[in-house]
Regions:
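Short alpha-helical interface segments
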Residues: 1-5
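Sequence signature of WD/YWTD-type beta-propeller architectures
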Residues: 6-13, 19-20, 27-398
Length: 398
C-alpha cells in the first residue's frame, strides 16, 4: 500500500541509522508547516473512524495469542512475511522513507516512522490498520530520532523515547504529545502488564541501575543499584516484565568475566539468579515466553584460550535451572529474540540490524535473513527474506 499523506517537506535525504538501504523519494514542496499543524486535527478526526474500524478488540495484549504476520523495514519500505508460507508483501511502499514497524499489542494496528526528507534526524510517527490501510500521522511536529517506539497495553497510545532521552506519550487519536519525563531510557516493552500502570527505565545519570515509575512519570523508585540492593549489582542489558507483570528478568554483571540472568519480583524483592550453569558465561537480553513459563536469552562461553564464543540461544524455566540450547548459534554479536505469539517458536535476527549505518546511495547497511526456531525440537528454518530492521510479530485473537 502506498503511503499518501500530504506534508510540506521535500522528500530527498541522506539516510543513516535505524534501518538499512533506504532510498530517498522526491516529491513536490507543498504547504508550509503552519498549514499542516492547523489542519492536523481535522486530518486525524477524519481518518480516525476508518482506522478504529480495523480493531478486533479481542486479542489480549499479553499472554499467548495466535500467530499473525511478521513486519520489518527494508529499502525505505515496510514488508510483511507469512511465517507459514514464506510469502512476502510490501505493506507500506512510499512515498518517502518509512522504517521501524511495530504492531500494537492487540494486533489491530501498525505504528511506523517516516523520515523528514529535509532533516534525516527527525521523524513523523504514523499509525495504520494492521494491513497498512488508513494511515494517520499522529505527530503534528516531527520528533528527534527515536531510541524507542512502544505501544501502551490498550493500543491507544505510543511511548516515544527520543534521542535526547525524553519520553513522550502520543495518543493515536490526535491530541498533542505529552512529555512524561526526560534524561531516561525506556526498557523494551516498558509498560507493566496488564494495564501499563508502571514503566521500567534507566537514568542517564545513573548507569547500571534499573528504575520503575508510574506511567505519568511520578513515584520513581530504584530496583537495581546501591539504593535498592545490598550488593554490587550492575545492570548489564535490557530488563523485561513477565507477561503477568509480577516479575522482571534482566542481566547483572557479576565481574569482568561473568554476566548472568537474574529475576526478581515486581516490587524489587526476591532477587535471585535464574541459571545454574557452571563455568564462565555471559548471559544477556532475557525475553519471556508469552506463556510466562520460560525465558530465552543470548549467551557466550569463554573457551580455553580465554576468547568468548557465541552459543545457541538458551532457554530456561522461569522457576530457574539449567539452560537448554535451542537451534543453531546466532551470529557473534548475538540474536534479537522475538517469541512467536503462541510461544511455540522464536524469531532470531542478528543484532547488526539495529546498528546499520547507511548514506544513500553508497551505503550497504546490514541486511539479515531471519531464522525461526521450533521450541519443541530445535529445528531452525531460515527464511529468504531481506530484513533491515527489528521485526515485529503480529498478535491475533486465539
Amino acid at each position: 500500500m502506498t503511503l499518501d499523506i500530504d506534508e510540506e517537506r521535500t522528500r530527498s535525504a541522506i539516510v543513516e541509522d535505524l534501518d538499512v538501504a533506504m532510498r530517498p523519494v522526491v516529491s513536490p514542496l507543498i504547504p508550509v508547516r503552519v498549514v499542516v499543524v492547523a489542519l492536523f486535527v481535522v486530518m486525524v478526526v477524519a481518518a480516525t473512524p476508518a482506522l478504529l474500524s480495523h480493531r478486533s478488540g479481542t486479542t489480549p495484549p499479553f499472554g499467548p495469542a495466535r500467530n499473525g504476520r511478521i513486519a520489518w523495514a527494508i529499502d525505505g519500505d515496510i514488508m510483511v512475511g507469512d511465517p507459514i508460507t514464506g510469502a512476502t508483501t510490501a505493506l507500506i511502499d512510499g512515498p518517502g522513507i518509512v522504517r521501524n514497524p511495530v504492531y500494537s499489542l492487540d494486533g489491530s494496528r501498525l505504528a511506523f516512522l517516516r523520515q523528514v526528507p529535509t532533516d534525516q534526524s527527525r521523524f513523523d510517527i504514523f499509525v495504520s490498520a494492521a494491513d497498512g490501510g488508513s494511515p494517520v500521522m499522529v505527530t503534528a511536529v516531527p520528533v528527534p530520532m527515536p531510541a524507542a517506539l512502544e505501544w501502551t497495553p490498550d493500543s491507544n497510545a505510543l511511548l516515544v523515547n527520543d534521542a535526547d532521552g525524553r519520553i513522550f506519550r502520543h495518543s493515536i487519536h490526535g491530541s498533542a504529545g505529552r512529555l512524561v519525563v526526560d534524561a531516561v531510557h525506556l526498557e523494551p516493552s516498558a509498560s507493566r502488564p496488564p494495564d501499563g500502570a508502571e514503566l521500567l527505565y534507566e537514568r542517564d545519570g545513573d548507569p547500571g541501575a534499573l528504575y520503575v515509575m508510574a506511567r505519568d512519570g511520578s513515584r520513581p523508585r530504584q530496583l537495581i543499584g546501591p539504593a535498592a540492593q545490598q550488593c554490587s549489582c550492575t545492570l548489564a542489558g535490557p530488563a523485561r516484565w513477565s507477561p503477568d507483570g509480577k516479575a522482571i528478568a534482566f542481566a547483572i554483571r557479576l565481574d569482568a568475566a561473568e554476566t548472568r540472568t537474574f529475576v526478581m519480583a515486581a516490587d524489587g524483592s526476591g532477587l535471585h539468579r535464574l541459571t545454574d550453569d557452571t563455568g564462565a558465561w555471559i548471559e544477556n537480553d532475557p525475553t519471556w515466553a508469552p506463556t510466562g513459563d520460560r525465558i530465552a536469552f543470548d549467551r557466550w562461553q569463554r573457551d580455553d584460550a580465554g576468547d568468548w564464543q557465541i552459543r545457541p540461544i538458551g532457554i530456561v524455566p522461569a522457576s530457574g535451572g539449567h539452560a537448554e540450547p535451542i537451534g543453531v548459534a546466532p551470529a557473534a554479536e548475538g540474536a534479537l529474540i522475538e517469541w512467536s505469539p503462541d510461544g511455540r517458536s522464536i524469531l532470531s535476527l542478528p543484532k547488526t540490524v539495529i546498528d546499520g549505518y547507511t548514506t544513500y546511495p553508497n551505503g550497504t547497511g546490514s541486511v539479515a535473513k531471519p531464522v525461526i526456531i521450533d521450541i519443541d525440537d530445535g529445528a531452525s528454518t531460515q527464511f529468504d527474506w531481506s530484513v533491515g530492521s527489528v521485526a515485529s510479530w503480529q498478535r491475533r485473537a486465539p
